[in-house]
């Protein structure tokens, strides 16, 4: 299986590269620079594509060219940026610069669509094509979050997923949107799960849990798929 992970240099993306795949599979990471401290066993092939999704068209072309020869089975789009004051009581839309709003829309929405458009012909050649979009609980109704550009971009991901399903259902394209709550991205996958789960005292999700969910999705047969999954922290009162 050839798996492409966009936004793979740190946090959840890095954990996905380290934690997914079986012997003989190829993991392809995408980020502006390859991280130096990846922990990957020798049984899986890891490649890297350096691309900056803040320049959507150029990045999409670069990534397409890098994976065209060997093909692609799964695209995991894990890239997203947010307002400088996001998740801070000081956040206010009126204080968010226009350039910041435009950058969020470009990176979180435009880049997603353009890259999928470029890679879709390759994906549809696979016997089991899959797209996994890492969204957010900020993209759910009554999320309780005020960040306008970030929230709108996560609602957009659900719309992208829904439209792709309708357009390519007969080609058996499986599209999943993961609505993730507050993640603990500072504790790496190499940390024992019981220790990682203590961080945040029930208010944060260890990356281990998300990796386990994605493993489950990738283990399904071609006869079914996970349409949408919401994964909040256990003490997140919004859900």
How does the language model describe each region?
Residues 95-98, 130-156, 161-162, 166-169:
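Catalytic loop of short-chain dehydrogenase/reductase
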Residues 81-102, 146:
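Conserved mid-core segment of classical short-chain dehydrogenase/reductases
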């Amino acid at each position: 299986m050839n798996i492409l992970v966009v936004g793979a240099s740190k946090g959840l993306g890095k954990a996905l590269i380290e934690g997914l795949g079986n012997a003989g599979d190829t993991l392809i990471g995408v980020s502006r620079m390859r991280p130096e401290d990846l922990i990957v066993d020798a049984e899986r092939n890891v490649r890297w594509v350096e691309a900056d999704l803040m320049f959507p068209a150029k990045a999409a072309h670069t990534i397409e060219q890098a994976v065209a020869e060997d093909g692609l089975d799964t695209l995991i789009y894990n890239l997203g940026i947010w307002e400088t004051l996001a998740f801070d009581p000081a956040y206010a839309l009126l204080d968010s610069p226009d350039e910041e709003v435009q950058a969020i829309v470009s990176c979180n929405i435009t880049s997603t669509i353009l890259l999928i458009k470029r890679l879709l012909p390759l994906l549809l050649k696979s016997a089991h094509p899959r797209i996994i979009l890492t969204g957010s609980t900020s993209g759910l109704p009554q999320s309780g979050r005020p960040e306008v550009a970030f929230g709108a971009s996560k609602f957009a991901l659900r719309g992208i997923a829904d439209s792709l399903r309708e357009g390519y259902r007969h080609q058996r394209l499986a599209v999943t949107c993961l609505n993730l709550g507050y993640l603990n991205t500072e504790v790496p996958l190499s940390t024992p799960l019981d220790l990682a789960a203590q961080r945040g005292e029930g208010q944060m999700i260890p990356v281990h849990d998300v990796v386990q969910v994605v493993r489950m999705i990738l283990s399904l047969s071609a006869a079914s798929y996970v349409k949408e999954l919401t994964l909040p922290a256990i003490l997140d009162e919004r859900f």
